[in-house]
Amino acid sequence: MGSSGSMVKPISGFLTALIQYPVPVVESRADIDKQIQQIIKTIHSTKSGYPGLELIVFPEYSTQGLNTKKWTTEEFLCTVPGPETDLFAEACKESKVYGVFSIMEKNPGGGEPYNTAVIIDPQGEMILKYRKLNPWVPVEPWKAGDLGLPVCVGPGGSKLAVCICHDGMFPEVAREAAYKGANVLIRISGYSTQVSEQWMLTNRSNAWQNLMYTLSVNLAGYDGVFYYFGEGQVCNFDGTTLVQGHRNPWEIVTAEVYPELADQARLGWGLENNIYNLGSRGYVATPGGVKENPYTFIKDLAEGKYKVPWEDEIKVKDGSIYGYPVKKTIHS
């Protein structure tokens, strides 16, 4: 819920703050260092204003910005863990909060970099590392993530998962998080205004279809090319919006989150307990439900044979429209 009570720690559950961080205009490594210090300052100042704060979330690209001419260069990329995450970890430890941060990560094995998110706990430990499974093609050059969708224990009875921006447009990503036990899905984004309605819609549907809370926040402001919509959103496990931010840079969207209620719904609901019902179809007629997979796309995806009927007619299948070189190697 969002209320005047969203200034202090609730008796159960936890208090979160979603930071509608101003989109950084980054031209050099020095600019990145300034953003890191600004993020650290924001952690401390937000904690001082909201003493009960336990989870603070920064949007995608808040650390390194979206300079598409430089974002894959050695100067702009970071290692994870590395000096940057060490600084975030120290800030989380000092302020006694969980923090969610965005890092464009140098590929430790060489090759294309990753778009990465981390969760750091109040002891300064990195407890989750996630690489974006679904880069926003054809705009983004990031390599598709290879760490799956990890889940970690968070504050107030929460089990946390993180997805990044475009990931949230795929219902399969939210379902994977819930299937692995997450009762809170965090979505950090760097979308421009063209998809703001769809962003809010999928935040709600991801919550409802999986009986979990969704905590979502986007960059805010203008970087000289696009306007980023902010609009931090906290959705209840029934798909309703508890709190909705506006388009203001630096707006702090706070909410009280009660993971135990999502857990109770998953255990106690009959109607619309769809995260369970998916694997127990028709359990009234068939005790225990039908377990066999009826879905062609799931079978084909699992076998590496996913192909839509119109695939041969699709016009855009590489990044050339945004100036990326066309690569001939096809992943098998």
Swiss-Prot record:
It catalyses: formamide + H2O = formate + NH4(+). Belongs to the carbon-nitrogen hydrolase superfamily. Aliphatic amidase family. Pfam families: CN_hydrolase. The lineage of its organism: Bacteria, Bacillati, Bacillota, Bacilli, Bacillales. Residues 14-259 form the CN hydrolase domain. GO terms for biological process: putrescine biosynthetic process from arginine. The keyword Methyltransferase does not apply. Is an aliphatic amidase with a restricted substrate specificity, as it only hydrolyzes formamide. Keywords: Hydrolase. Its EC number is 3.5.1.49. The active site is at 60 (proton acceptor), 132 (proton donor), 165 (nucleophile). One of its GO terms (molecular function) is formamidase activity. Coiled coil: none annotated. It comes from Bacillus cereus (strain G9842). This is Formamidase. It comes from the Bacteria. The keyword Hydrolase applies.
